[in-house]
Amino acid sequence: MIIGVLNGPNLNLLGTREPAVYGTATLADIMAHLEGVAGALGVQLRTAQSNSEGALIDILHDWRGVVDGVVVNAGAYTHTSLALRDAFTATAIPFIEVHLSNIHAREPERRHSMLASASIGMICGLGADGYEFGLRGLVRALELKRQSTATG
């Protein structure tokens, strides 16, 4: 199984960007931990980060038929990007949305996700651990779907 991990705008600044909100772990720290978790689960990761909405969409298009699912932190595009949501639905890649902070306890403009209704689920407010929980949840959901299809 191959899982993509897609990170959106400003996540490259983790560790220094508003540590009281996002924590002190860098994106590299989070991805290194996730690689270890993936190894224990027997899955491979493909990771990408971009500050550009178009680049994130291109990555999803490129991952079509390559990855089995995606863990995504779309950053601020979560709240604004119908195009990113459309890329997920157009590629039919199942995904779990993760956020370091609890978006539902943030400013009003950050409380709505354009992606959530198309996702398998959302994990928010658990800091860097949310990525691990998202990966584990996605792998489990995909395994259950495969079992259901096989016995269907």
Swiss-Prot record:
Pfam families: DHquinase_II (PF01220). The keyword Glycoprotein does not apply. GO terms for biological process: amino acid biosynthetic process; aromatic amino acid family biosynthetic process; chorismate biosynthetic process; quinate catabolic process. It comes from the Bacteria. Substrate binds at residues 73, 79, 86, 100-101, 110. The record marks 17 as: Transition state stabilizer. Its EC number is 4.2.1.10. Pathway: Metabolic intermediate biosynthesis; chorismate biosynthesis; chorismate from D-erythrose 4-phosphate and phosphoenolpyruvate: step 3/7. Keywords: Amino-acid biosynthesis, Aromatic amino acid biosynthesis, Lyase. The active site is at 22 (proton acceptor), 99 (proton donor). GO terms for molecular function: 3-dehydroquinate dehydratase activity. It catalyses: 3-dehydroquinate = 3-dehydroshikimate + H2O. Homododecamer. HAMAP family: AroQ. Catalyzes a trans-dehydration via an enolate intermediate. PANTHER family: CATABOLIC 3-DEHYDROQUINASE (PTHR21272:SF3). Belongs to the type-II 3-dehydroquinase family. This is 3-dehydroquinate dehydratase. It comes from Gemmatimonas aurantiaca (strain DSM 14586 / JCM 11422 / NBRC 100505 / T-27).
